[in-house]
Amino acid sequence: MVQLSSPTSFDFISAASRFATPGVTKEDAEDMYRVMQAVRAQNPKLPVTDYYLSGYSLGALDAAFVAHLDETRRSFNFKKVLLLNPPVNLYTSITNLDKLVQTEVKGINNSTTFYELVLNKLTRYFQQKGYIDLNDALLYDFQQSKQHLSNEQMAMLIGTSFRFSAAYIAFTSDQINRRGLITPPKFPITEGTSLTPFLKRALQCDFDCYLTEQVIPMWRARTDGGSLLQLIDQVSLYALKDYLH
């Protein structure tokens, strides 16, 4: 089994993406396809009976485009492709996730931040358990306890995590392409450089901001224009309607 990083992860953006601007699903799928071919080329003696492909959430959307690409490239001839909870309309999905950070949460005020609220709950949770065990089942077990997060708190947590993801993508894409939106183009960055000022600036940019400032200009420059609605159709499952049917 081979597990690929998401095209939105900083390692994939920096090492495997041709344009270092994830968000145009067809381009992301082509990058993933090249990585898959490279992995196979590095293991020429590994016997393979059949190829299967699966993806979850954004990965499911990417998997659909990779499978469609393979219909013409015929490099893998996937026997089965499993799409788990793919976003039908990518723009609608990211817009909804962007809005979660605006959720009103009871208990948050000028003296108590959301992070303090969550940390206090985690502290009480571990005190009641009597030990600290960080594992894959932590969130499920925590949500079954008396300290569980409410729907509003969970929405805020998801929204906050999503905002950080957007910031990492925006920073990495801007830095590699020298666009100067977050990091000055000629600003020297070394191992000892503090990235805090750039993180603060990147956190002001949600996914809609990243789409507007980086994805759309890059896409228009490569396709001689096009409207936002055209891009939305091209990056969502709508583009594969005939293929999926």
Predicted stretch roles:
Residues 172-245:
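C-terminal subdomain of alpha/beta-hydrolase-fold enzymes, centered on the catalytic histidine
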Residues 21-43:
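Alpha/beta-hydrolase active-site loop
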Residues 65-69:
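Active-site signature of alpha/beta-hydrolase-fold catalytic machinery across serine-
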Residues 43, 70-74:
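Active-site catalytic pocket residues across diverse enzymes, especially alpha/beta-hydrolases
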Residues 1-15:
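Conserved alpha/beta-hydrolase
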Residues 74-198:
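Alpha/beta-hydrolase-fold enzymes
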Residues 54-63:
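Gly/Ala-rich beta-loop-alpha elbow adjacent to hydrolase catalytic centers
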Residues 5, 54, 82-85:
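Alpha/beta-hydrolase-fold catalytic nucleophile elbow
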